[in-house]
């Protein structure tokens, strides 16, 4: 489940010395960047460009935090169904969240000030429309796109989707042709990355992520 936080975790490990032993529950920072502009889109609404947030990719979770508001979210990797990058034009990292576990974040977004697109909460109203699907897209305009994307690849591989893994085994045993479009790390295989590594998904055109990437589940 996505967790709302009012401060960044204080026990984050930002540097690991050679030979240092770590406990399984310790949270290692693989990527960190402050003042990241972002955009949010649900299945029904697209919000304006948001103000700056702190982004952390750790061994345990994907963290978005607004230091001005002392408010943020710890997002488990199991809720991330797709991540990709665009390296041309205006570079960004794209993250797609899906599933019932993201409901707290979706409900919170309904209280955003839509006129400014910030993380400031606006008073709730009785006639607010509910989201029809637990689906959310994040576009993060990080400075170092490659490092952020690689960190996401690494950390998400530490938290494999058990349900998807079971489906992959079943698809392979049944000869399902759709299994040919996934690699073992659950990355989308396209014409752009078929001859490259599993973590080489990217947007290199101005096309919308929704148009360029198609889900098959």
Curated annotation (Swiss-Prot):
Any one Gene Ontology cellular component term annotated for this protein: nucleus
Keyword entries, A-Z: Cytoplasm, mRNA processing, mRNA splicing, Nucleus
Annotated InterPro entries: ICln/Lot5/Saf5, PH-like_dom_sf
GO biological process, one term: spliceosomal snRNP assembly
Domain of life: Eukaryota
Subcellular location(s) of the protein: Nucleus; Cytoplasm
Disruption phenotype: Decreases cellular levels of Sm-class snRNPs and leads to abnormal splicing of a subset of introns. Decreases vegetative cell population growth and leads to heat sensitivity.
Pfam families: Voldacs
Primary location: nucleus
Known partners and oligomeric status: Interacts with smd1; the interaction is direct. Interacts with smd3; the interaction is direct.
PANTHER family: CHLORIDE CONDUCTANCE REGULATORY PROTEIN ICLN, METHYLOSOME SUBUNIT PICLN
Family recorded in the similarity comment: Belongs to the pICln (TC 1.A.47) family.
Job of this protein: Chaperone that regulates the assembly of spliceosomal U1, U2, U4 and U5 small nuclear ribonucleoproteins (snRNPs), the building blocks of the spliceosome, and thereby plays an important role in the splicing of cellular pre-mRNAs. Most spliceosomal snRNPs contain a common set of Sm proteins smb1, smd1, smd2, smd3, sme1, smf1 and smg1 that assemble in a heptameric protein ring on the Sm site of the small nuclear RNA to form the core snRNP.
Protein name (Swiss-Prot/TrEMBL): Splicing factor saf5
Organism of this sequence: Schizosaccharomyces pombe (strain 972 / ATCC 24843)
Gene expressing this chain: saf5
